[in-house]
Amino acid sequence: MKVLKSWLNDWIDIQDIDSNDISEALESLGFEIESRTDKVPNYKNIVVGKVLEIYTHPNADKVRVTKVDVGSKVYEIVCGAWNFDIDAVVPVALPNSEIKDGFKIDKRDIRGIESNGMICSASELDLWDDHAGILKLSKNTKIGSDFSKIYNSVDTLWEIGVTPNRGDCMSHLGVARELSSYFDKPIKSNDIKLSPNIENVIKVNSGRTKFCDSYLSVEIENFDITDSDIKIRYRLSSVGVRVINNVVDYTNYVLHDIGQPLHAFDRDKLFGTISVRKAKENETLKTLDEQTRKLSKDDLIITDNDSPIALAGVMGGYNTEVTDSTKNLLIESAYFDKVSIMKTSRKLNLISDASIRFERGIDYDIQHKGLERFISVFKHDQNINYSEAMISKKNTFSHENITFEKEDIFNILGVELKDDFILKTLSKLQIQSTLADNKISFTSPSWRYDLERPIDLIEELAKHYGYNNFNSTLPIGKNLNNKGEFWNKRNYISNLLSSKNFYEVQTLSFTDKEANSIFTPEKNSVTVINPIDQTQESLRTNLLTSLINTYKHNYENNTLSCKYYEINNVYDDGNHKLYKDIPNQEYSLGLLIPENETNPDTRGEYIQNDIHTLTNIINLLFPKVQFEKLLRPGFHKNYSYVLKLNN
């Protein structure tokens, strides 16, 4: 993710803090800095001008001659761009100035007409890559003013890595919250006062589905599709977003500003009540990319009078898109279930800035602020008529109060943190907390899904205390020469199976809940907190699924049919034998023998295996084992057994 210093300064006063110190702070707070760019453009003698006259060049048909008022004087300038007219407000490079790459601008003769400077494009000023024509500024911009004052020309851009559990940091506000604690500077309130002046035409509701907690909308009437404000275009371009027009740019701006995805509909193409539901099997929707998508019952959609008009949180529909002729808008701001959005975006290969933020978890209480922010930015651009927000909310979210002993901090960190530091740090992070009787109680804010256990808060305190402030200590442990009975048995099993041409595999412990229930329905799965892959939300209760998947993958990729074994942990939600409060885990041995095995010596004819091949191997491993018939759904009634050893 890319963040801009001047943009961060909207939320926290850091303009006077050296960019090197901010880089150090970001790394200390756990953000990997992937790149840094210091923007120091030279805008000497570049001012704001107004085009007074335009006429044809007497000796050239591909350029025009203009007269431009720069406040103190009117200059005659020859220009090759055709995207502006009389009264356009533009940046002007006067004689004795420099533009991008140190290119010098002076008076020059162009086919018999003296050109006193240059009217500039965004690309020529190194703002963003736009070669479509001259950069047009707001009509309200003061003529003759220094162009460098139009926006913060000296700036720093960081590209940082954000871990999957910190979806709240996928915005400038989120990063500013972290820096707020580090630099002990408050977050700016940026309160917005709005005065709606029209009534809502379209009704909205969040539907009966549990996958949409809130759905809000606001309507705008009789506006103009134009270029967005220069500051917005500069900021979006800097963070890698393509600028299009004011509507699209302002929705993208809110996304990168506070982390709330928005979507714009052409209100004149809507006819009834906007709602949210799961799609019907094989229902279709034509999306903005003009592709007709066949949907499944797992896809969450937005409907108008129950007809699909958008893929919730992923992509809008073609039939309700905003075009250059759009005059009335409906802006959507919603909270959609992150797992549902992830499944749809991955299945359809439609991954966007919005879907990524929904997947990682957005603030469930910021939807109204997203609409306010959009209206505020739009109002700055032009006079608009807008409604108050239409709100449909289920209020299904709440964060539990978590309590733990203060001594747990010392036991884990080895550092005695003072009460004042603990409370002050949590307050700056807007985490509600109390400290009494050596117990800390806290409730995480609506944007922090990663604070679910005491260890999460302790990690947060360690981060803001500063890992560089911890004293180095040598680890204390015992050096045992003997490997122990378990490892002796493990080595014996591994050596024996390897001698019988088995390949050992090591697979991840994550799986989906349904895979567990196939082979071990009697065991309850352990749910993974905040899984990186939402389809791998459980810990395995058996090794059979992973062995089958390994065989399938290897056979499909190299056509080898091999024998495999795995010795690894399996888990269930029972009580651990030694440790309380953690799930039960046990080592398990899994074997897989194909009916037709690739000959490891010749890679030629297959070796034929059957149930006796497997029982012979088991008897070698465990000579006193007993086989009892297993009757269970999903298992072959003649070839399934329970193995018993010493009863």
Q: What residue ranges belong to the model's regions?
A:
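Phosphate-backbone binding interfaces of nucleic-acid-interacting proteins
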Residues: 1-193, 330, 347-348, 353, ...
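Conserved phosphate/anionic-ligand binding catalytic regions in large, soluble enzymes, centered on
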Residues: 2-7, 81-89, 164-183, 240-264, ...
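Glycine/proline-enriched, intrinsically flexible loops and inter-domain linkers
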Residues: 24, 64-66, 183, 187-284
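Conserved mixed alpha/beta core segments that line enzyme active sites in large multi-domain catalysts
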Residues: 34, 48-77, 238, 251-319
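Short, glycine-/Ser/Thr-/acidic-enriched flexible segments
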Residues: 52-59, 73, 82-84, 95-99, ...
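Extended beta-strand-rich architecture
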Residues: 54, 228, 248, 353, ...
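Mobile "lid/hinge" segments at catalytic clefts and subdomain interfaces of large enzymes
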Residues: 111-136, 147-152, 156, 290, ...
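Terminal amphipathic helices with adjacent charged low-complexity linkers/tails
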Residues: 179-207, 382-409, 416
